[in-house]
Every structure is written in structure tokens, then in C-alpha cells.
Amino acid sequence: MNNTPIGNRKSIVLVGNRNAGKSTIFNKLLGFDRSIVSSVAGTTTDPVWKASEMIGYGAVRIVDTAGLDDIGKLGAQRVAKSEEEMRDSDLLIYIFNIEDLVNIEEEIIRKKIKDIKNKYKDKEFIFIANKIDLLDEKILDDIKLRYKDFIFISTKSKENAWLENLNNKIIEKLKNTEEEKSLLEGMLSYGDTALLVVPIDSEAPKGRLILPQVQIIRACLDEGIKVIVCRDSELEETLKENKNIDLVITDSKVFDKVADIVPESISLTSFSILFAREKGDIEEFLKGARYLERLKDGDKVLIAESCTHTVSHEDIGQVLIPNLIRKKTGKKIEFEFVYGKSLPDDLERFSMIIQCGGCMMTRNNMMNRVYAAREHNLAITNYGVTLAYLKGVFDRAVY
């Protein structure tokens, strides 16, 4: 369960004002206390998340966030972190303290709901009125008539019927979300054979495969596709021994070497390109790679990785790609590096973004980066497409 990659989990994000009961509901959904719960407003500062298995649906990621009405300079930073999680979500659960529904005019509440739905148009929503134990029955009945689209709960209730109702609603909403494209869609089908080329160099972890390789192997097994794995040093021999290869999938670092060995009759792609197809906009990435030729002296290129790792002399992002770009263009290009979920606020400083394969990212994470690039009129591509272009196999590879 907990080994399902974060990038393959649907993201459920709990939002609302401070002291609306987000953390209590978060803990109830998980079945144990993960977030600190307090009557003091602003207890949750940074987003808190936990991977979980939702019975009846599957692997999810549930996120508790700071209040959207947090105040002060630090409060503004907390709200920004909450909004980052909201952008990356599949389902937003907006929690109101029911006293707000009593004390604030319905027109204002409805405008708030309309505004947030307009801001996050591609998300599913659930609206909750919490702390119904604070109201007498007559006032509660009136509020329920006015807000029929809400789920009304009290987390203090000894009966957890509300929790079952909420779980069912979450599953219903998640089933409405976009299904991610299969990693191998349009590339391979049942009964085909894939040959995976996995170089073992200083960056290869000892005793295990890296996540993209594992995910591709699993995708092949799920779809009844036979898998052969070899190192680049044994590729020629492996091809001679196996005459029915339908697709070769290689690590991008050895794209050119592999392209020289694999016959033109066999399709060739990379692990990173397959993730670009699944997670992002492959046409945008292809267009972005062509922009490399237009880079000028002094241009800044942002290289974005979704996770952190120690850097070796063979590192793709920090060493290989910058060196190849300088060699290809002959220009004095400046490179900056960013890790994790956030991009810099001042993207206008850059000429283009080169994104990692994104095996740890959801499609929402990746597409938010594509949207940010478009908003700032920047080219964007990913490691695999970039290396195909720089190593002279751009037209040979399949996308």
C-alpha cells in the first residue's frame, strides 16, 4: 500500500479558514492522529500529508493545510503553501465552521464558493459544514435548507455515520477525475515485447532499480507485455538473441549509443519520454526542445527536479544537460536549479524550463509547471526530450 509512488496517488486536500476543524477531519479520514488538533486558531502551519489506502478506491494522498485566513507575513507564506497544495490537488474538501454560515450573509458565502470554483476549475469539490453541535436544532434545520449542497457534520459525534458518508462522497468525486494515460498507451499492446536498457554507472543505486524503471516494468506486466532488461554494454548481444523486440526503452544518458545499435526497424524511446507523455504535454515538450537552438549568450535556463539527491559527476540535471547545451549552442548560458514542488516566483528571469522526468510527480504537478511556463511565455521541455535533441536522436525517437 504505502509503496505506491506519490506521483500515482490522487491528492485530496482539506482547506478552509483557521479553526474550522480541518485537522480533526484529516485525522478521522486517516484513522489515527497525524495532525495536531487544538482550539487555538492557526495550529497547522505547513501542509501535513499522509499516504493512505481508501477502501473502495485505492491509493490516495490526504493533505491538511493552514487556514486560508491566516494573517501577518508568516500567515501569507502559509496561505501560499496551502494554495500550492490546492493547485496540485484532484479533490478539494472545503470546510466551513457552521457558525460562519449563520453569521455571514449567504450571498457572501456563495460568492466565496463561486470564486474558488472558478480559480480551480479542473478540481472536484466537497463542501462541509462542521461543528453542527454548536447550533440548536431549529437554526441548524434552516441552515441545512439553505446549503443543500453541503455535508453537515460534528466531529464530536460518537457515531461516525458522517465519516462513512464523507468517504463515499470522496470516492464518488475521485472517480470523476481525469484518468491518467497509461505509460505505454499507443506504444505497446498485449503480447508485445519491450527491451529496457539500464546502464549501471555511478548514479545507479546499489542493489535496486530506480523508480522509473520499476514503474515501466510494472506497467508492462499489468498489460501482458513481455519485458527483457539489459545493460547498454550487452545491448547488441541481447538484440541478436531476441528477434521479436517491438520497442526499446532506454535511459536518456545513453540515447545516442543505443540509437547507433538498435535497428531502424525497432521503435526507440526513453523512460523520461514515457513519463513526459503520461504526466505532461508531450507536444509542448517537443516544441520546448526545439527552442534550445534559439538560446543566446546570457540567457538563463531553469532546471527543475521534483526530488532531491546527491550530485555525481554523471548527474543528468546538474552536469550532463548543461554541458551538452553549452556544447550544442556554443553560447554562454546560465543555469539555475530548483528542487521539490515549488518554482521560483520570478520566472520571467528565465528563457526556458527543463523539467525532470517527474516519476515522483502527479499529472497535476507537472501540468501546473506547463501552465506556469505558458503564463510567462517560456519554453518548457523535459530531460528525456532534451537529451534526444542534444544527442541527435530527436527524429529517431518515438513520442
Where is each model-derived feature located?
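G-domain G4 guanine-recognition motif of GTPases
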Residues: 65, 95-100, 125-139, 152-161, ...
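Conserved beta-strand elements of the Class I
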Residues: 13, 94, 193-195, 300-302, ...
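C-terminal effector/interaction modules appended to NTPase cores
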Residues: 17-23, 207-399
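Long, well-ordered amphipathic alpha-helical subdomains in the mid-to-C-terminal portions
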Residues: 187-213
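Conserved G1/Walker A P-loop phosphate-binding module
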Residues: 1-76, 80, 84-86
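Short, flexible loop segments at the rims of nucleotide/cofactor-binding pockets, characterized by
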Residues: 39, 68-74, 98-105, 173-175, ...
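Canonical P-loop GTPase G-domain recognition
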Residues: 123-126, 131-186, 193-195, 224-226, ...
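Conserved C-terminal guanine-recognition region of P-loop GTPase G domains, centered on the G4
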Residues: 51-58, 74-151, 182-186, 209-228, ...
